[in-house]
Amino acid sequence: MTLTIYQTNDLHSNFENIARIAAYIKDHRKKEDLFLDCGDLCDLKDITVQGTRGIGAVRILKHAGVDAMAVGNNEIDLENKSLVKCAGEDIKMLSCNITDNDKNPLDGITGSVIFNRCGVRFLVIGISPYYSKSLKPGKYNVFFQMGNLS
């Protein structure tokens, strides 16, 4: 079995790059391949992101064929309510370590997803950096302390 994982990160609302990336993947992608984004898609420097609070950017990435995306610090900048709305756009948004101020997971955001490809299961985990007043760092810090990485 040959599987290609297409991966993007830190696109920072450079949508002209997304169009080129999507065209390349569409031309080369096989059914079993994965397309993952590692976050920082929704940069507030862009009017599309500002006006739609990230939903426009998420729809563009979804249209490009992404299988899942991690929540990056730029998505966290959208704050909880907008982030939950983005997750409601029928896209797998991943973060195993962010919660709201009451330490509850955010609706629509899961820590991981399993993809079955050619009889093999692939676990994809999303981990987000902490940069926002509206999200608590507790789980993030504990996660890395447990790994003796802090």
Question: Predicted segment positions?
Answer:
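Acidic, metal/ion-coordinating pockets
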Residues: 1-150
